[in-house]
């Protein structure tokens, strides 16, 4: 059996407490949490609670709502971690659950997923999540 639950992000919402998850924001349809292999402090993932592999399989209404939710989170990230812009990326090849990356950036190279990832402690992740949440 090859399903979202057995492979990754799809169940991150359902499996809170079982796997590392630093929540930033949540509503009835979407969940935002820190990427545990961040490119920058504040690198956040936004996912729909609905299990869907490909972001463009979401209904038009849900896709639009996801981007409005992501915008609120991105604005909070930008306040918590001053940057030129908060970049948005949708890749979706490694993780079989639709998600948006929100990454604080000073230049375009900050968005390269081949860049080294930050190694942060549990305390650092908690402080970053709190800083973003306080700006919402």
Regions found by a protein language model. Name each.
Residues 1-13:
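Single conserved hydrophobic/aromatic residue that forms the stacking wall/gate
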Residues 14-58:
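N-terminal first-folded block
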Residues 45-67, 113-120:
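Short histidine-centered catalytic/ligand-binding loop motif
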Residues 64-81:
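A long amphipathic alpha-helix within ATP-dependent nucleotide-binding catalytic cores
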Residues 81-93:
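A short glycine-rich, hydrophobically flanked beta-strand micro-motif that places a catalytic Asp/Glu
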Residues 94-99:
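A short, glycine/Asx- and small/polar-enriched loop/turn
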Residues 100-106:
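Active-site-adjacent beta-strand/loop module that shapes the phosphate/pyrophosphate-binding cleft
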Residues 107-136:
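Conserved His + Asp/Glu catalytic blocks
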